[in-house]
């Protein structure tokens, strides 16, 4: 913003709350304005646009000054002498005024105006919240700024948002009076989807505020935002239909609902939704994963096994979206029909179906005539793999067993309206698919493989045109169609690294354009009780009628090793360095897995007895059976007492197993410890004095690929983990060729269950599919304790128990919080 001189703004100048919990700083504590500049997410509001004089013949104050006692009460920092030790460098005032004239235009307090922008750029938008003259007779006004969408984290995706829509900020600073350009008309409207019908003629309108901490778009608290001078000022801000802003009474009523429904997209084996439901349960909210969608059939089998109450769909999400739209049409046609169906209608349909079943039992096929008995399922896609995508029903034919069931296109069932109506009515009643407004919460991590650093052909210029990134668009389109109350998107940090954070900005822009509040943060798995450093991005969304959830602060002391883009490093969920907090000691590999029984490279048992006792609190609680855990229903399939699932490793081939047996059982051991390898300045080379060693198969003990990996500078090939370590991440492939995966004391890679422990899966969570598929499910999962912590803050938001702060302290640690009865107090060693 235009200024005569460069100086620091005082705490009084900028009213962004400066809670130590809001920012993690690697340097000494700084004030909120300096933090904003360090984040560099916005064009600087403090830069001088072009030379302006503080006093001008075309700018002057009008009328008598505000009485001294009134002015000193409202702006005390302007009338106190600066202490040399104080950070307060605010300008001092001789008089305050209510009106000023600039270039013949009369301005009043609380008027809105354009303020001179930088050369060649648009003028800034602000509310005049203060007018004063300094002891040196310089004329200033204080601006409270509005952001255009492109001034926020959305940046280049500002086109997603209405050009007339702006966002209020808490940022204020002083500017020379003659920087005012002209008055503008800004209206405040209710933050709802019908806003376009309610917008009166204006230059701009706003319904949310934007704060730099955690890049937050949120509702405006009208009571706290109202100026005491606004009634006198003749302000040109109009508040329109304010009753549309959320009301606490509605929120309290909603929190008494028996359950909240969750749709898990890109669900994998269900780790994210499982954790969210755990956390919500701890907060006092019953969250149920009603629907889940994933393209991997083995992951779907795992989720269904552990969550029999969930409708699990194994299909692409774009087909799922098409199905949702078709399902809504069918429900309109057969159920709603312009009005809600009565219970008697639904019961009549059920009775008709039962009658048809009874009649079918008396019939037997006497010819090859196929008659539809009932419809079993519905999908959109190409189930017959005949390149004819569309809407299909699975048909059970009258007089035939299930082996004759087939998928039939809707066009071929035009004579089966009764069967179709029965299916739709029952499906509607059972909510086999969500209709708009029925999914309270949508979570998911749309794969964005086009941003991966392993992808050499990334499209940096147009990331959304890359087929590998299109799932982000599909995810947002599903949200747009279903209109859930809450949204949580998870993704890799690369979405903020790649192409200037293009995809992350797009995601925020889509949510805001759909009238969702939004907030972005990064969380490290190790900070919530796991021995791994993995960092992930989480984006919250909440309708204007709901409270925007916060992020849970860490419970364990772990320093992340992830490379975070400088522009986004301040959204890391963490305590500030100067904040006194009591964090538990980081969990290491030993504390997580050393109670598990030894297994061999070729072990193939999918379940076995523990044969051991837990040695740490983590091990004690991670072994809990379903009946002992929060949020698990009685119909969940319970593991037999004392049985351990999935504790088997990927079987290495003969050559790799022989190599692993040669790796010393010591900290830091890897292929560099093998005979014939020299290391000079962290780069490997062959030892010319040693003859190359060969395996029984005739292949070399030290493979060439190990010597050339990362140009000979990597120590990862055939690396052995150690008990006191924390792993960088849990991988999807258990091959030891370029990863540190070997067990500290056994000649094998970590087992599926050991990897699952590192991701926080309870031992009772059984996985399905081939061994490699189970490793993939675990590696792709969201760490369960991270999801649990987020579920807890979601529950607080639903209950109306959280404030506007982006961060919340957790009153528990993982995994002791899983216990249905907390008779044993966690001593902090977990």
Descriptions of predicted regions:
Residues 1-17:
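PEST-like, low-complexity acidic/proline-rich intrinsically disordered segments
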Residues 2, 116, 121-124, 133-140, ...:
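Eukaryotic short linear interaction motifs
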Residues 31, 36-105, 136-251, 346-349, ...:
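Epigenetic mark-reader domains in eukaryotic nuclear proteins
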Residues 110-111, 121-134, 141-144, 373-377:
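Short beta-strand-centered aromatic/proline hotspots
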Residues 262-276, 397-399, 435-457, 486-492, ...:
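Conserved proline-anchored active-site loop of SAM-dependent methyltransferases
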Residues 263-324:
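SAM cofactor-binding core of SAM-dependent methyltransferases
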């Amino acid at each position: 913003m235009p200024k005569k001189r460069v100086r620091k703004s005082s705490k009084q100048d900028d009213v962004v709350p400066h809670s130590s919990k809001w920012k993690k700083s690697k340097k000494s504590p700084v004030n909120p304005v300096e933090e904003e500049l360090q984040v560099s997410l916005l064009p600087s509001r403090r830069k001088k646009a072009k030379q302006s004089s503080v006093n001008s013949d075309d700018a002057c104050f009008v009328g008598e000054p505000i009485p001294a006692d009134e002015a000193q009460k409202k702006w005390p920092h302007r009338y106190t002498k600066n202490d040399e030790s104080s950070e307060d460098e605010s300008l001092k005032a001789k008089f305050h005024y209510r009106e000023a004239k600039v270039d013949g235009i009369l301005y009043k307090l609380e008027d809105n105006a354009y303020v001179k922008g930088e050369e060649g750029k648009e003028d800034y938008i602000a509310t005049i919240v203060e007018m004063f003259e300094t002891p040196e007779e310089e004329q200033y006004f204080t601006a409270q700024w509005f952001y255009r969408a492109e001034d926020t984290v959305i940046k280049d995706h500002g086109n997603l948002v209405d050009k007339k829509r702006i966002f209020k900020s808490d940022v204020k600073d002083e500017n020379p009076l003659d920087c005012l350009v002209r008055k503008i008309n800004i209206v405040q409207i209710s933050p709802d989807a019908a806003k376009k019908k309610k917008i009166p003629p204006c230059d701009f309108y706003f319904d949310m505020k934007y704060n730099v901490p955690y890049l937050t778009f949120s509702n405006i608290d009208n009571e706290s935002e109202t100026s005491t001078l606004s009634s006198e000022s003749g302000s040109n801000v109009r508040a329109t239909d304010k009753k549309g802003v959320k009301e606490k009474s509605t929120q309290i009523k909603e929190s008494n609902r028996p359950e909240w429904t969750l749709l898990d997209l890109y669900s994998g084996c269900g780790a994210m939704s499982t954790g969210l439901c755990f956390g919500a349960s701890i907060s006092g909210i019953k969250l149920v994963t009603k629907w889940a969608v994933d393209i991997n059939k083995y992951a779907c089998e795992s989720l269904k096994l552990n969550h029999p109450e969930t409708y699990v769909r194994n299909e692409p999400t774009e087909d799922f979206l098409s199905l949702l739209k078709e399902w809504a049409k069918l429900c309109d046609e057969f159920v709603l029909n312009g009005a809600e169906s009565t219970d008697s209608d639904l019961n009549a349909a059920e009775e008709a179906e039962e009658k048809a079943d009874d009649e079918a039992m008396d019939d037997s096929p006497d010819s090859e005539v196929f008659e539809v008995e009932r419809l079993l399922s519905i999908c959109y896609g190409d189930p017959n793999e005949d390149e004819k995508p569309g809407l299909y029903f699975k048909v059970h034919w009258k007089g035939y067993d299930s082996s004759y069931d087939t998928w039939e296109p809707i066009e071929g069932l035009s004579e089966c309206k009764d069967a179709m109506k029965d299916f739709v009515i029952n499906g509607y009643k059972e909510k086999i698919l969500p209709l708009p407004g029925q999914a309270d919460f949508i979570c998911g991590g749309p794969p964005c493989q086009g941003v991966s650093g392993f992808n050499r052909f990334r499209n940096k210029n147009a990331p959304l045109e890359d087929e590998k990134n299109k799932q982000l668009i599909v995810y947002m389109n599903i949200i747009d169609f279903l209109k859930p109350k809450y949204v949580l998107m998870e993704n890799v940090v690369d979405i903020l690294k790649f192409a200037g954070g293009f995809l992350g900005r797009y995601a925020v822009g889509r949510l805001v354009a759909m009238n969702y509040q939004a907030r972005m943060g990064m969380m490290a798995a190790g900070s919530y009780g796991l021995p791994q450093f993995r960092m992930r991005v989480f984006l919250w969304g909440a309708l204007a009628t709901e409270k925007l959830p916060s992020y849970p602060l860490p419970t364990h002391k772990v320093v992340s090793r992830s490379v975070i883009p400088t522009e986004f490093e301040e959204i890391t969920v963490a305590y500030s360095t100067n904040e006194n907090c009591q964090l538990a000691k980081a969990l290491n590999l030993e504390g997580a897995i050393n109670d598990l029984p030894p297994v061999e490279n070729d072990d193939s048992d999918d379940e076995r007895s523990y044969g051991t006792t837990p040695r740490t609190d983590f091990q004690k609680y991670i072994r809990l059976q379903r009946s002992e855990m929060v949020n698990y229903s009685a119909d969940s399939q319970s593991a037999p007492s004392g049985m351990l699932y999935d504790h088997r490793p990927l079987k290495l081939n003969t050559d790799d197993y022989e190599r692993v047996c040669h790796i010393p059982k010591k900290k830091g051991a890897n292929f560099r410890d093998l005979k014939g390898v020299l290391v000079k300045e962290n780069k490997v080379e062959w030892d010319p004095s040693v003859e190359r060693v060969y395996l029984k198969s005739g292949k070399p003990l030290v493979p060439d690929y190990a010597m050339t990996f990362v140009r000979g500078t990597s120590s990862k090939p055939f690396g052995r983990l150690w008990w006191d370590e924390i792993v960088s991440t849990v991988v999807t492939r258990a091959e030891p060729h370029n990863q540190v995966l070997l067990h500290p004391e056994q000649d094998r890679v970590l087992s599926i269950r050991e990897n699952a422990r590192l991701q926080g899966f309870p031992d009772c969570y059984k996985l399905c599919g081939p061994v490699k598929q189970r490793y993939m499910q675990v590696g792709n999962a969201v760490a369960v304790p991270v999801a649990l912590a987020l579920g807890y803050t979601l529950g607080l938001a639903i209950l109306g128990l959280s404030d506007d702060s982006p961060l919340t302290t957790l009153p528990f640690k993982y995994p002791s919080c899983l216990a249905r009865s907390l008779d044993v107090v966690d001593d902090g060693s977990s």
